[in-house]
């Protein structure tokens, strides 16, 4: 009777364990296994080949839950695939490594690795030993790196022309290529803003560049904000919608009457007692609001709720309040403005306040109705910068963001390494010529792999 895959335990006799499998199970070994792995790798490369280069086409991805995406971004395509084959899983890991290391170039990396596997399959069929094959590939890699270093050019943070060219190359073939010149300039300025020098080496934290999706207008309306953007409606109509330069305070705690950590009951027997109780509560509220007013802050961000009475009092004093933002948003405000997140009103002092240049709240129509958008401009001192991506919403804006993200990472890597090279296949051709010339000087079978 056929049974599922099982294995007898080792009885200590030294004999190999016996595997019991279904009659329909096929067992493959030797060169046949290698060819199956090669076939899977080649198939994975062919999946992305149609999206590569300036004439590459987009792919539509459809999930079982109904979500769709139209993209030619290799990292996005690979991330959405359900992969079970061992060789294909290795390629998924390769794509993840490339994305984590460079933030771009996943498609080219996968296609190149796939072609190496294709060639290795042919050579293995001709009985070339795998170790000789690996040695040949390593020799070719060394020649390639040497040639690339020879043909590379230095670049500095202020070399706008070269950095814009890097951004344009990364945008080629993407949805944002049509306004590439304009967006390349935005990307370069964003990188220059967040770049910091450490031990005579430029370090670019791309996480300090935020991408905000406006969902309206055209792609050419995209702008760079030296600060942050919040898509959130104001809680009160009378809150100021425009502020000039001033101070900002960031709270991680709620601005309301503090609740006790245990249940308590208060017995009130007269109207005078009730009036005294309400007056005391009102006094606490006024005191909290007055502390904020006295601090000189013009703008208040709170990661928790804000009592409407406090909000009204602050609004009457010309102070804008944005309440119930997520903690990550509050941390962004603190990072951008130089403020410190505080967990109690009593902690407000000059050292905890941040600074901003201007704040404006704009209202615009969207597919979800009338929306408020708060723009916090901090200026050159801002620890964050935001690219406000316009032009469509949904999958369209997501594809715009992916294209900008690739360009951003490419420019950041160029600044950090201080080296750029020609694009358009130039490096591939020069490396191929150098490797072929080097192979002619090798006499052994290793030459076949090179």
Which stretches of residues belong to each language-model region?
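Core, soluble structural subunits of large cytosolic macromolecular machines
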Residues: 1-450
């Amino acid at each position: 009777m056929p049974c599922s895959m099982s294995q007898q335990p080792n009885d200590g006799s030294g004999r190999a364990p016996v595997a019991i499998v279904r009659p329909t199970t096929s067992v493959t070994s030797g060169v046949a296994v290698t060819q199956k792995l090669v076939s899977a790798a080649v198939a994975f490369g062919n999946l992305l080949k149609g999206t590569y280069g300036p004439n590459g086409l987009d792919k539509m991805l459809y999930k079982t839950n109904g979500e769709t995406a139209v993209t030619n971004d290799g990292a996005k395509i690979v991330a959405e695939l359900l992969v079970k084959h061992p060789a294909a899983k290795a390629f998924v890991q390769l794509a993840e490594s490339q994305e984590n290391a460079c933030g771009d170039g996943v498609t080219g990396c996968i296609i190149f690795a796939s072609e190496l596997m294709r060639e290795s399959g042919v050579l293995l069929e001709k009985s070339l030993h795998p170790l000789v094959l690996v040695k040949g590939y390593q020799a070719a890699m060394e020649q390639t790196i040497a040639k690339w270093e020879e043909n590379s050019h230095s670049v500095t943070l202020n070399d706008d022309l070269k950095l814009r060219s890097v951004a344009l190359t990364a945008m080629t073939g993407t949805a944002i290529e049509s306004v590439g010149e304009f967006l390349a300039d935005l990307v370069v300025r964003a990188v220059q803003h967040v770049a910091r020098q450490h031990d005579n080496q430029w370090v670019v934290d791309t996480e300090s560049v935020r991408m905000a999706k406006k969902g309206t207008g055209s792609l050419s309306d995209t702008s760079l904000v030296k600060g942050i953007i919040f898509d959130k409606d104001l809680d009160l109509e009378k809150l100021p919608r425009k502020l000039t330069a001033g101070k900002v305070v960031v709270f991680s705690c709620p601005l309301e009457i503090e609740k006790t950590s245990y249940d308590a009951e208060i017995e009130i027997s007269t109207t005078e007692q009730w009036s005294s109780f309400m007056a005391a509560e009102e006094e606490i509220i006024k005191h909290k609001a007055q502390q904020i007013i006295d601090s000189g802050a013009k703008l208040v961000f709170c990661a928790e709720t804000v009592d409407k009475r406090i909000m009204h009092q602050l609004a009457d004093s010309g102070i804008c309040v944005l309440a119930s933002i997520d903690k990550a948003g509050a941390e962004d405000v603190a990072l951008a403005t130089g403020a410190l997140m505080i967990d109690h009103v009593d902690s407000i002092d000059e050292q905890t306040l941040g600074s901003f240049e201007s704040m404006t709240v704009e209202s615009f129509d969207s597919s979800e109705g009338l929306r408020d958008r708060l723009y916090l401009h901090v200026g050159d001192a801002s620890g964050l910068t935001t690219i406000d991506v316009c032009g469509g919403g949904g999958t369209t804006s997501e594809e715009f963001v992916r294209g900008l993200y690739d360009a951003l990472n490419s420019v950041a890597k160029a600044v950090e390494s201080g080296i750029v090279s020609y694009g358009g296949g130039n490096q591939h051709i020069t490396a191929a010529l150098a490797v072929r010339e080097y192979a002619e000087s090798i006499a052994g079978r290793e030459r076949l792999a090179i």
